[in-house]
C-alpha cells in the first residue's frame, strides 16, 4: 500500500494564478435567469486568455446561494487584461442584473491543493 500524496504548499513565486470567488444570494424567482446569464456570460470568460477555468455552483442546503469560482492567470490579468477588454463589457452586460445579489467578491491565492485525476 503506497503513501498518500500530501498537498504541496504553493507560494506567490510558484504561481501568480489567483482564484476569484463571487458569492451570490439570488431570490428563488430569479435563479433560472441567473443560471442562464452565467451560461451565456461563460462564453466571454472562455474567450479571455486570462481566464483559466470557471464554475458556477449552487447551494445544496440553500439553493438560492451560488458561488462563481474563476481561476485567472494572475490578478493583473484579471483586472488589467480582462476588465479592460471588449469581452468584459459583454460579460458584465449579462451579469449586471445580479450585482445587487453579490455577498462577496474577492481574489484568493491557492496555498495548498490536492486532487485525484
PLM features per residue range, with description:
Residues 18-25, 55-83:
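Short, well-ordered beta-strand segments in beta-rich or mixed alpha/beta enzyme
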Residues 1-2, 34, 38:
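Short, intrinsically disordered, low-complexity terminal segments
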Residues 25-35:
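Short, surface-exposed ligand-recognition loops at beta-strand->loop->(often short) alpha-helix junctions
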Residues 2-18, 55-67, 92-117:
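Glycine-rich beta-strand-turn "strand-cap" elements at beta-sheet edges
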Residues 32, 76-78, 113-115:
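Residue-level signal for secondary-structure boundary sites
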Residues 5-8, 32, 87:
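Intrinsic disorder/low-complexity segments
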Residues 29, 40, 61-63, 86:
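Short alpha-helical
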Residues 40-52, 71-106:
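An amphipathic, aromatic/His-enriched active-site/gating alpha helix that lines ligand/cofactor pockets
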Amino acid at each position: 500500500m503506497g503513501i498518500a500524496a500530501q498537498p504541496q504548499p504553493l507560494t506567490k513565486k510558484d504561481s501568480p494564478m489567483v482564484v476569484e470567488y463571487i458569492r451570490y444570494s439570488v431570490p428563488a424567482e430569479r435563479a433560472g435567469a441567473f443560471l442562464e446569464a452565467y451560461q451565456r456570460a461563460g462564453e466571454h470568460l472562455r474567450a479571455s486568455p486570462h481566464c483559466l477555468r470557471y464554475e458556477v455552483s449552487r447551494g445544496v442546503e440553500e439553493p438560492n446561494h451560488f458561488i462563481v469560482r474563476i481561476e485567472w492567470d494572475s490578478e493583473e490579468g484579471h483586472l488589467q487584461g480582462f476588465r479592460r477588454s471588449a469581452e468584459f463589457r459583454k460579460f458584465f452586460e449579462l451579469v449586471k442584473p445580479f450585482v445587487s445579489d453579490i455577498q462577496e467578491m474577492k481574489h484568493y491565492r491557492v496555498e495548498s491543493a490536492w486532487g485525484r485525476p
